Structures are given as structure tokens and as C-alpha cells.
Amino acid sequence: MGALRGRWAEEEALRFLLGKGYRLLWRNRRTPFGEVDLFMEKDGVYVVVEVKQRASARFGAPLEAITPGKVRRLLQSARFLLGRDDLPVRLEAVLVHGTPKDFRLEHLVLEL
């Protein structure tokens, strides 16, 4: 997510997930496979959260930016951060539609 532009969207996504009982483990953690926006835990499952924001549909919907390659890299990043690949990991996305003054959130589980 772009540094300053997307920071507010990431803050809103984090607030939303914390309100749903998620626990933050790492934020903006870099790995050899890319950056993980939010690495969280919920009910004993590790959760990698990708946050995507779009002010308008001009450049496509936020979900369109999460390609199969991105999903693969997120899973590789999770395994790297955990140091093993036998723990339950779920990939999720928080899509932020709009601007800081007028937005809505969409929360999805990504298929592996």
C-alpha cells in the first residue's frame, strides 16, 4: 500500500479487525516475497491481511489488484514470518472504497 496515501485506509482496516477480536502481531513487515500489511491472529489461526484502497473505480476495484501471484507471495511471506509451513494460515483482504471522509470497508477471505 502506498506510504502516506494508503496509511489512513490501513488504520481503518486495523481498527475494524481489532474490533472483531483480531490480535495484531506485525504491521508492514517486509519479507523476501514482499510486504505484509497486517499479520494478525484470530481464534488460533494466523491471518495475513492485505489492505487495498481505491478512491474511485477509475483504476479498477480494489480486489482486482490482488492477483493470484500476490496471493501466492502473501502465503510465502506468512510461512517465512512463522518460520514453518505446518501452522494454519488464512489470507484475508480489507478493501477500502472511497476517501478518508467518505468510505466503506469490505472484508473478504481470499481463496488459496
Swiss-Prot record:
Gene Ontology MF annotations: nucleic acid binding
CDD domains: PoNe_Nuclease
Domain of life according to the entry: Bacteria
Protein name per UniProt: UPF0102 protein TTHA0372
Pfam families in UniProt: UPF0102
Similarity comment: Belongs to the UPF0102 family.
InterPro entries to which the protein is assigned, alphabetical: Restrct_endonuc-II-like, tRNA_endonuc-like_dom_sf, UPF0102_YraN-like
